[in-house]
Amino acid sequence: MAVFKGITPEQIDAICVGQYAGVDEVGRGPLIGNVVTAAVILDPHNPIVGLNDSKKLSEKKRELLFNQIQEKALSVSVGAATPAEIDEINILHATMMAMQRAVAGLSIKPTSVLVDGNRCPDFGMQSHAIIKGDGLIDAISAASIVAKVVRDREMEALAAQYPEYGFEKHKGYPTKAHFEALAKYGILAEHRKSFRPVREAM
């Protein structure tokens, strides 16, 4: 595994060969719900305009691109690790496991895997970690968008079930509103009990 920081266009060209998969995660920081990952193999002959780091896109733009990715990509797969798994093996290991699940779920076996960040799990094939890759490589950008939309939808479903917690607004992140809801209503089965603010509310 190679880790790239400040990657050059030439380095990108050198590693972006064949049917490579981009991988990213969403949801390491929240106090509740799954950590969600996605793996995407784009079609170089059917490009998608406007891909970028999901955090830099509006919700409307993410939804639009999400639909285009589903239509145009060669393969898209979503992985996740549950709160119970996060509590058992910790958030870092759970994230790596969810990434492995996303790649394993692809309908096409990729030639290599490019992961946003500074580390990769063992995919059983060539892989590269690319710092800030979600803003540099379209396949990683696409994965970040898919993971973000999927996790946000999970939080909206949870918000419909437990409206008093405001999950549709803070998406489970440790905000003042979330802390206040924990203090007032207590924890839910979906909360990550290994995270300190949740433990303290138990």
From Swiss-Prot:
Keywords: Cytoplasm, Endonuclease, Hydrolase, Manganese, Metal-binding, Nuclease. Its EC number is 3.1.26.4. Its cofactor is Mn(2+); Mg(2+). One of its GO terms (cellular component) is cytoplasm. It catalyses: Endonucleolytic cleavage to 5'-phosphomonoester. Manganese or magnesium. Binds 1 divalent metal ion per monomer in the absence of substrate. May bind a second metal ion after substrate binding. SUPFAM superfamilies: Ribonuclease H-like (SSF53098). It is found in: Cytoplasm. GO terms for biological process: DNA replication, removal of RNA primer; mismatch repair. It comes from the Bacteria. Gene3D superfamilies: Ribonuclease H-like superfamily/Ribonuclease H. A divalent metal cation binds at D24, E25, D116. Its main location: cytoplasm. Residues 18-202 form the RNase H type-2 domain. One of its GO terms (molecular function) is RNA binding. Endonuclease that specifically degrades the RNA of RNA-DNA hybrids. Belongs to the RNase HII family. This is Ribonuclease HII. It comes from Shewanella piezotolerans (strain WP3 / JCM 13877).
